[in-house]
C-alpha cells in the first residue's frame, strides 16, 4: 500500500494554525498533590487547521484528495514543521463555492501514527 503525499503548497498568509490534543491521566489527592502521566505511547496528537481558497480545478483536486483520507493516512509537512502522517479529522472537511472562480476548502488534519 502506497501512502499518498499532500503536495499542494500552503500559503503562510492564510495563517495556518497547528495545535495539539493531549491524552493524559490525572489523579488529584486530598492534600492538593496531583499525579499526571501521559496515556499511551502517543499521548500528544498534533492538529492542523487547513484552508485553501483558489481556482476551482485545484480546489476540487484538494477536496477529492482529502475525501480519500478521512480514514487513510497521508504524508504532510506543515509550514515550519516536521513531516508526519496525518488524516482528515471526522466531520471537518468543507467546500464552499464563493463564485465561479473561487472555491474554499477547509479541514482539520490530525496526526496519525500508522497508515
From Swiss-Prot:
Chain's role: Part of the distal tail tip which plays a role in DNA ejection during entry, and in tail assembly initiation during exit. May bind tail tip complex associated with tape measure protein and allow tail tube protein polymerization on top of tail tip.
GO cellular component term, pick one: host cell cytoplasm
Subcellular location: Virion; Host cytoplasm
InterPro entries in alphabetical order: Phage_lambda_TipM (IPR010265)
Organism of provenance: Escherichia phage N15 (Bacteriophage N15)
Family per record: Belongs to the lambda-like tail tip protein M family.
Protein name: Tail tip protein M
Keywords attached to this entry: Host cytoplasm, Late protein, Viral genome ejection through host cell envelope, Viral long flexible tail ejection system, Viral penetration into host cytoplasm, Viral tail protein, Virion, Virus entry into host cell
Pfam families hit by this protein: Phage_min_tail
GO biological process, one term: symbiont genome ejection through host cell envelope, long flexible tail mechanism
